[in-house]
């Protein structure tokens, strides 16, 4: 899928993306720079993912805040993706996948990120750190 100019520059502005775990770079696969400082966060997310999807294996956690959610295909996924949506007073933000709109608020969704998908427009997103305890009570929805 060819990226438009908007898609290539979508991370600029006020969006915030933090990636921890194993990352690919031109120097090969390596542990991300922020990984060691994010261990408490990684432990909580790992606990939630293992509880909801015991067979799911992953190497990287990407946390997005104010992400524009354009239509895209995840570039380096080997298998499925899990999307955890956490926030307060969220309106919108559903996942568009395979021609369907899938509600995401307070949910964990498993889907194939190698297929086109996007986050629909949303408003009022909360900072993640004080919401981590809410992750332990998140529900699941599995995309077809």
Residues covered by each model-derived region:
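Fe(II)/2-oxoglutarate oxygenase catalytic core
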Residues: 1-110, 114-144
